[in-house]
């Protein structure tokens, strides 16, 4: 992963989202140790405090848990929590933006639904 250092999204958020993606794709399983703040700092050439902040976000959400002296580990419910969070935050925001733009363009609800149905998974992944 390449961090977007010039973007508006803070680096620690990008780190936490990258770790979430690693969990979703199966790179990290339940109860498996994740990278330390120092490993992340070296991997992405960032300050260890920034990496720690990304890990802390996931720990506060219950996606990771800390074993004193051993590091951070993936919680048993991490995958479900990430999926739920992304569905409730990311998808709702995207749908809101699409509906708002459709309204601006005078696209009817039926037309919008038709457009969504026309998009196949293969097209969306391209």
Named regions from a protein language model:
Residues 33-65:
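N-terminal helix-turn-helix
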